[in-house]
Amino acid sequence: QISASVKSDGGIRFIGRAGVGVDNIDIGEATNKGITVCNTPGASTRSVVELTIGHLIASTRHIATADRTLRNGEWAKKQLRGSEIGGKRLGLIGFGRIARGVAAIASSFGMEVHAFDPFVDEAPEGVQLHDDVDEIFRYCTHISVHCNLNEQTRNLVNFERISLMPGIGLDGIECGNHIVS
């Protein structure tokens, strides 16, 4: 949090964003005040890819819940039976650097990988591109969202789309504003 006095005294010359999204920065106001704004695309790609795969495995295997119940003295083995991700269908919304990394690892686990990105014409072998984002929700058991937040992607994930899914599994949400709660 930057205080109002710091903003108004002209001391800020540069705002650096560790990551891609700059939707939380008023670029117009920064430009008017002569403040340079930059982001760091690619700097944390591998970390986000690994975290996304970690969330995918943790959610399908109920790792966090199992940890909590075990710490509370319960052994809930039967209630927390997870499933393997191999053979499941992963839908990637957005197919840039992060999603491509997720696709490569998910494929190595035996997942069937599908992607939607209106700006991508070709996908690597083993990834099926779709022209309609609703197809991803209809067909895939797990969804991972990896696109910049803008007016076209705000509230992209909503009740209607989630209700299309054969099973529920949302992962890799880079920004919660993609989801309508």
Predicted segments with their positions:
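Phosphate-binding beta-alpha-beta segment of Rossmann-like dinucleotide-binding domains, i.e.
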Residues: 33, 41-89, 101-105
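An N-terminal-biased, well-structured beta-alpha scaffold segment characteristic
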Residues: 1-38, 138, 158
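Hydrophobic residues in well-ordered beta-strands that form the structural core
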Residues: 24, 37-39, 115, 131, ...
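Rossmann-like dinucleotide/phosphate-binding beta-alpha-beta segment
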Residues: 78-166
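Short, acidic/turn-prone active-site loops that include or flank metal/cofactor-
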Residues: 18-22, 42-45, 119, 136
